[in-house]
Amino acid sequence: QLVGAKGQALGMNVLSVVHRNKPEGCECETMHFVTMDELLSQSDIVVLCAPSGDKPLVDAESLAKMKDGVVIINVSRGANVNEAALLDALNSGKVKAAGLDVWLSEKDPNWALASHPAVSCTPHIGAGTKEAQKRIGAELVDIVENFG
């Protein structure tokens, strides 16, 4: 939701796919909820903020449905991206750029992908917002207070 709100503040038309009902309390009243195929074919930038599923959200099949020159950002789980397919798409120009905060293997990242000139990497800090840290602190206090 926060990614969508920030995109809207920058004037972006934000599309979202949810596999459940629209999130309760979603502040993005102008966010458009669409199918995955609609999102893939219409988006200039695809931001992954989803838990891991049965298969990667970004693979050769989904990349083929995307616009040429798409930008892909993954701040969720490394398993959501087929790294070999993304590297092929970057090399062919199908994907213009990628921002990656997570890897399939954090201990042994795909160095060909990490060193690609069109890839920007961060060390798994996508969830390190002030808001997230406050929530973590509150949860820890709750755990300590209710211990035993």
Named regions from a protein language model:
Residues 1-8:
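Glycine-rich adenosine-cofactor-binding loop
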Residues 20-111:
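Rossmann-like adenosine-cofactor binding region
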Residues 1, 77-78, 124:
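Alpha-helical hinge/cap motifs
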Residues 12-13:
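Residues at the starts of beta-strands that form the adenosine-phosphate
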Residues 102-148:
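C-terminal helix-to-coil terminal segments
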Residues 17:
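The conserved SAM/SAH-binding core of class I Rossmann-like methyltransferase domains
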